[in-house]
Structure formats: C-alpha cells, structure tokens
Amino acid sequence: MANVLDTLMERGYIKQFTHEAETRELLEKEKVTFYIGFDPTADSLHVGHFIAMMFMAHMQKAGHRPIALIGGGTATIGDPSGKTDMRKMMTNETIAHNVACIKKQMEKFIDFSDDKAILVNNADWLLNQNYVEFLREVGVHFSVNRMLSAECFKQRLERGLSFLEFNYMLMQGYDFYVLNKKYNCKMELGGDDQWSNMIAGVELVRKKSQESAYAMTCTLLTNSEGQKMGKTVNGALWLDPEKTSPYEFYQYWRNVNDADVEKCLKLLTFIPMDEVRRLSSLEGSQINEAKKVLAFEVTKLVHGEEEATKAKQAAEALFGKGGDMSNVPTYEMGKDKLGSELLDILVEAEIVPSKAEGKRLVKQGGLSLNGEKVADFKKTLEEADFENGEVLIKRGKKNYNKIVLA
C-alpha cells in the first residue's frame, strides 16, 4: 500500500505528529481506522472544516477508513480551544438539527458505502454517562497540573475558565478511547488548534487500553499574512449553498491573493502536484488562469460540476466575456418596497450583513448600482433604477448580486 503520509506532507497538510516514525510504519503496513471530530455549532460546515474533510478524503483514497465523529455530546459543553470567552450553550434541539444538516453535507465528500467510512455521534455514549463512573474510569488518568499547562486552557485562565469547559479535554479523550475499543480506531486527525486535546486522547488510550494510538494535526487554512481564510463581508464562507451561494463561493477563490494560490491548490483540490507547481509558477496576469482553475475545482468539489460551471459562466458574463448572467445570485423584491432605502433592502436580501457594513462600503466607494457608485447612505431604490426589471449590485471589486422586481 502506498504511504499516504508522503502525499499529505508534500501537499502541506501535516503540522504535528505524536509519533512520526511509528505513524509512517503503521500507514505502510495496514489499513488504518482513524477519526476526525466535528462539533455541530452551526447547521453547516464552513471552509475551515473543508480542509479537514480533504485530509480525510486523501486518507480514504489511500485505503484507510475514516470515522467522522459529530460532537453532539461535546457540543453541549463547547470547546475552549482558541476561544477568549465561553461559548453560548445550545439547546439539545438545536444540536440535533445541526447534526442532521452536517451528516447530509459530509456524505457529499466521504464515501460511507460498504463500511468504507463510519459516521458516529458522541452523544450516543456521553449523554447517558454516569458522572461518578466517568471520573473513576477516565478522570484518574488526567493530571490537573498538566491540563492547566495546555495551551487551550492557558489562554482562558486570566479571563475565566468554567469547570464545564474544563471537562472538554476529558470528553474528547474519552471519544478516542470508545472508538478504539469499538472500531479499533488507532489515530486521530484534527486541526492544529486541537493539539492539546488530541495528545490527551492518545495518552488515555495508551494508558487505559494498553494499545498503540497516534495523532496528526492538520495545518489551519491561513493566508500568506497568517490570517484565517474563509471570511467574507457576510461572515463565514459556508459549504451550504443557502448560506453562501455557489457564485459567491467561486468568486472568493477566484480573488485570493497571488501568494495564496499554491497553498490553496495543494490543500483544497486533488490536482496532481506537477500541475499545481505549473499553475503556481505563472506570473503577472497569467496567475489569473491558476485562480480560475482553483475556483472551479474547489466549487466543483463542494457544490458539484453543474453549479461550478454556472458560477464560472456568471463570472465571465460580468467581466465582459459572454456567458449566462442568470446564474448571478438574485433577490426578488416586491413593488411595495420601491422607495425604500437601498441599504435596508440590501440587508433584507442578505447582500450586506448590516446597515453599518453597508454604510462602510458606501463611504469607501465599494458599492455600485448598475455600474454607478452609490455616494448617499440614504439612497432609495426607485422604479427608474430598474433596467428591464432588474438592478445589478456590485460590492467591492468583484462581488455581484441582482435585485429583480417580483
């Protein structure tokens, strides 16, 4: 069996190992069951999750078996890693809804047929867990002094860390123990911000089960300046087309900085590395061809080839190269809204997230109506603004929406 580790390292996925040499040997000699956890804090995955699913997909293509663990139980607490404040607690009904939505999305990326992958929810073993038994069985293996030295807790101690959140590491470690017992799961993969929690899981399995256990972390998706990628003017870049349209999704990748093209091609597509190197070596205006390939390939993986083609055609239409403008995200407005302030309509249509953000765009000259910059915050939308029953809104340099009269 070819060692997938070489592929993952060449493409820049791997950040840290618990046992690099043993991990390499294990992946060479057997089909390994591994897991990645996803907390259902929203009803859709976003781009930050997508890189984890690509990690899983590369492993699955190499013959290994993924377990996608949905944290229906741990979500009732909330992961303190990388957070400055305690997360708002969600109701069980909200968590159940989010779990159902995420399951449906995952099945687009990972092959769950014929036991090639497994989908589990840690609510199945955490929610009915006897607390005293849990402390005796799991808590005895954790040192409070060592836990407090973990990066995920150190960042929170000054602002206040609840005992509720302090339990998160034990629960995530217990997940690995349960999966090891039930499915012979030997490895956890996760984002680099999960390193402390993952080490705890590896050590729990090794101490309690006397079994080999390993962890690898995946690099986080950041740009050349070290900032997390996947944010738009409307918030996170979601994988749900109802939250982020395929066109807006396509345009995000079409407009990445030149310095980020190679990293994104490596991490977010299956394009062979020779072609990645060729595309990344393009200079000047030619790098735009690489960005088009990136945008199409990522959109195809997330939304399918048909939606990727529509998004590409819409972009070409808007930039004067022909194509079908019907694929530009469209909002239908009733005639009773004529005379309303443009910014109010844009907020209602979710074209801008808030009126304050709309005002900021206007102030910076970043909002246009039918090609004309909007200069007045209080500009109203009148019937005369509509050409053939529609107006074209432009946000920033390359984000377009249509408003049509219903």
Swiss-Prot record:
Any one of the GO BP annotations: tyrosyl-tRNA aminoacylation
Assembly with partners or alone: Homodimer.
Name listed for the protein in its UniProt record: Tyrosine--tRNA ligase
Role description: Catalyzes the attachment of tyrosine to tRNA(Tyr) in a two-step reaction: tyrosine is first activated by ATP to form Tyr-AMP and then transferred to the acceptor end of tRNA(Tyr).
GO molecular function, one term: tyrosine-tRNA ligase activity
CDD domains: S4 (cd00165), TyrRS_core (cd00805)
Pfam family membership, one: SYY_C-terminal
Domain of life: Bacteria
Positions that bind ATP: K231
PANTHER family the record matches: TYROSINE--TRNA LIGASE, MITOCHONDRIAL (PTHR11766:SF0), TYROSYL-TRNA SYNTHETASE (PTHR11766)
SUPFAM superfamilies cross-referenced by the UniProt entry: Alpha-L RNA-binding motif (SSF55174), Nucleotidylyl transferase (SSF52374)
Gene behind the chain: tyrS
Subcellular location: Cytoplasm
